[in-house]
From Swiss-Prot:
Keywords: Cell wall biogenesis/degradation, Hydrolase, Secreted. The gene is amiB. It is an enzyme of class 3 (hydrolase). SMART domains: Ami_3. GO terms for molecular function: N-acetylmuramoyl-L-alanine amidase activity. This is Putative N-acetylmuramoyl-L-alanine amidase. GO terms for cellular component: extracellular region; outer membrane-bounded periplasmic space. Belongs to the N-acetylmuramoyl-L-alanine amidase 3 family. Residues 3-206 form the MurNAc-LAA domain. It catalyses: Hydrolyzes the link between N-acetylmuramoyl residues and L-amino acid residues in certain cell-wall glycopeptides. Cell-wall hydrolase involved in septum cleavage during cell division. Its EC number is 3.5.1.28. It comes from the Bacteria. It is found in: Secreted.
Length: 217
């Protein structure tokens, strides 16, 4: 199972900036590196990083890189921001089902997309569609993250983010906390907290795919 890890923003695009001037692009890269390392220490996943340093990549280029690595799944790492500095917590985003169904129909006759479906089915047996994979996995990631962090939302949220919309494989966006919240900004910049977030996502991924394999064997 090949998982593409996308560190949000980069280069001239710092992403959100906290009160203490910590930048989202640096936090996402650090968490992405830790998550990639954890996944590659398992015998179940091969993780590849889309952005490896401090440089800018368009959404289109990110999806291109993931496709180049023949990714079966994409996890995009971000940090949230709000004008209300009291808001905090983790949230997980997936593509709305109606948009998903339209996207699937558009790629239905695309041989490459069919091959991606085949790869997913080979590793995790039969899935109905991308939406099911994303939503069910997102719920398990939330279950794990709530053990180490506060939640902004108890269920996966819907959005038409470019990285979700233009990927030709299941994709999930993880907002690891609010960098606009001074306390959470400090947490997000600490290696200990980044390790907790990375480990939680790694555990969730393994739980989800093992569950699916057992379910359909």
């Amino acid at each position: 199972m090949i998982i593409a890890i996308d560190a949000g923003h980069g280069g001239q695009d710092p992403g959100a900036i906290g009160k203490n001037k910590f930048q989202e692009k640096n936090i996402t890269l650090s968490i992405a590196k830790k998550l990639t390392k954890l996944l590659n220490h398992t015998n179940f996943f091969k993780a590849v990083m889309i952005r490896r340093g401090n440089y800018f990549l368009s959404v289109f280029k990110r999806t291109q890189i993931a496709e180049k690595y023949h990714a079966n799944l994409l996890i995009s790492i971000h940090a949230n921001s709000s004008k209300n500095r009291k808001i905090s917590g983790v949230s997980i985003w997936v593509l709305p089902k109606n948009v998903h169904n339209t996207r699937i129909q558009k790629h239905k006759l695309n041989k490459k997309t069919k091959n991606i479906h085949k790869k997913i089915n080979t590793k995790t047996s039969k899935f109905k569609n991308f939406y099911e994979i994303e939503y069910d996995l997102a719920k398990i990631i939330i279950q794990e993250l709530r053990k180490v962090s506060t939640l902004n939302q108890k269920k996966p949220k819907y959005a038409k983010f470019g990285i979700l919309k233009f990927s030709q494989f299941p994709s999930i966006l993880v907002e690891t906390g609010f960098i606009s919240n001074p306390i959470e900004e400090q947490h997000l910049n600490k290696k200990f907290y980044q390790n907790l977030i990375s480990k939680s996502i790694s555990i969730a991924l393994k739980k989800y795919f093992l569950k699916r394999i057992k379910q359909y064997n």
